[in-house]
Amino acid sequence: MTQGVVNVRTYFYRGSLIDPPTGWLFNKKSGLLIFFESYKKSLSNNLKVYTHLFYANELGEPAQIKNSKLHSIECACETWNELISGGWQIVTNKFR
């Protein structure tokens, strides 16, 4: 899974956050993918982010969902930063 993966250090900080974290992260060791998406119905002063954790197939694509969770924007940013620091990689591919 080297195509479509970027090893970029992208950090989100509470004080300077413009947009919530969105997109896919991949952990090659565990074979897991996580998708961050904004919760469309959250109020602008109380933004929420969904995370959807997937098992990946041999091509590094989402195969089966493991769980979904709704987070505050602070929790989502903290989770994103911890995953990036832990070696998860940003996925640039668009999955269908």
Model regions and ranges:
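Terminus-proximal functional modules
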Residues: 1-96
